[in-house]
Amino acid sequence: MSVNTNEGSKNLWKDLPLELLSSVMTFLEIKDNVRASVVCKSWFEAAVSVRVIDKSPWLMYFPETKNTYDFYDPSNCKKYTMELPKSLVGFIVRYSKDGWLLMSQEDSSHFVLFNPFTMDVVALPFLHLFTYYQLVGFSSAPTSSECVVFTIKDYDPGHVTIRTWSPGQTMWTSMQVESQFLDVDHNNVVFSNGVFYCLNQRNHVAVFDPSLRTWNVLDVPPPRCPDDKSWNEGKFMVGYKGDILVIRTYENKDPLVFKLDLTRGIWEEKDTLGSLTIFVSRKSCESRTYVKDGMLRNSVYFPELCYNEKQSVVYSFDEGRYHLREHDLDWGKQLSSDNIWIEPPKNAFELV
């Protein structure tokens, strides 16, 4: 007598207890979770039960008055307006991380960390700068013991000065290293894997480790890109689960995506983001694994609103096109833009 082992195997997998299936699904990346969900009804139920929807960042921008600021939530296309504390009127946004902003006066000497949802302000020690700093960022919210604020500047050829500050310190810590790295046009700084990654105009990467206080320029050739300076205008670096990605584009050109492969010492070009959604801006970028239905996955959201600030400009890799194609991204305008994506707290709707 013959036995249909294939049919038996199918039934065995289909009839696994929901608790066991759900336990297995928790170990899957989101793209594999989605694939598993189409196998059968029981797998769909298990996959969906453990699937975590990432809350999208909000776009924060300043009207011309500068006395207020607006939030735009791309998940529901709603806008919220809040009043800027009088003490921060005239301050400029430099960087964003974990729902906080690093801001400074025009001369860059007076830095503060500001939470635009709770209105909390943390003043940093005065920083003596004879000229404008070139890169700046911070590792985490100032409520964390791991918070490190980082600035870098080259005062003379062949040397860079790195300054750091952490909560509880009354002054900045300074160090100088030999390096020809600094030739930057945008603030491309990402904190990931416990270190700061910095990208310069020539698309070389340097790494600063705040715990070891070491600075190293990686021996990685720049990503291959059309030999056109315009491609430097739309250049963004973002971190995702330990990976470093660079997005490059200009005007209405399709974005190019590169992933840093430290093992092989190369930038690997990617033609898809999978289920990832990236939100880019001049000051800092955000990434989300699985945004809610109604938003575009495998896409890049730009810091530009149109149609009376009702919709954001998005490029979809699935469709190979920009949404709102007729709206040109003015990269020259974006260079000086204060528009920035920021992570809202869980209770954001109670605060705005």
Curated annotation (Swiss-Prot):
InterPro entries: F-box-like_dom_sf, F-box_dom, Gal_Oxase/kelch_b-propeller, KIB1-4_b-propeller. Keywords: Kelch repeat, Repeat. CDD domains: F-box_SF. It comes from the Eukaryota. Residues 10-56 form the F-box domain. The keyword Magnesium does not apply. The keyword Repeat applies. It holds the Pfam family Beta-prop_KIB1-4. Kelch repeats lie at residues 148-189, 190-234. This is F-box/kelch-repeat protein At1g57790.
